[in-house]
Amino acid sequence: GFGKTKKYSDGKKVENIEDLFFEFLRVAEDIKPKVIVAENVAGLMMGEAKQYYYKITNEFEKIGYDVSSMVLDSSHYGVPQTRKRVIFIAVREDVTEAVGLTFMNIAGIFPDKFSEAITCGDAFSDLEYDEEEIKMLTEKFSKGSHFETASKMPKDPDKVLTGCDYHPKGHHFNMKRISRHKPAPTITASGGCIHWSEMRKLALCESQRAMSLPDD
């Protein structure tokens, strides 16, 4: 688990953070589990936001945990989506002492990357589509503000394309044309990803596959 730090997604310093971090630490201190696995946005390791990262590690140590962290990308571990998160592994100090764990031993717990990433083409290859949903998505997209920009983006690209590169004023940064040859970019609540060859946003079943969720 972990507290929300949405405002640190891009690594910028923000005052008056609205997150659950201290509540999370309070619960951890009360329960005192042997091991804590926590995650947060990768932006926590960037720029001025890194001050908050150091605060997190210091707080873990204050309540009696040896902690190690690493930025992992879900596309390296069998998920057809690029999603970077900083993962914390904290082990209670009495446990590390009892079994002879060191900081380097804890860091070695993080998994090795898979040899090959799963592409969108691989992940979507056997999907059964709801034709009514596809029709609705296509019609809705054709009437939306992103249609003109999307029409300028090449179809079936070798890599993920970003809308701002095809908008005269650099707008539509969050719109991405996915590539069937690559994992999807990070799926967001705004649903900014569009199909590699069709003029529509991703269908529900495609988004589920990109997030490695079960079809049902």
Listing of model-derived features with the role each one plays in the protein:
Residues N16-T82, V86-V91:
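Conserved Class I SAM-dependent methyltransferase catalytic core
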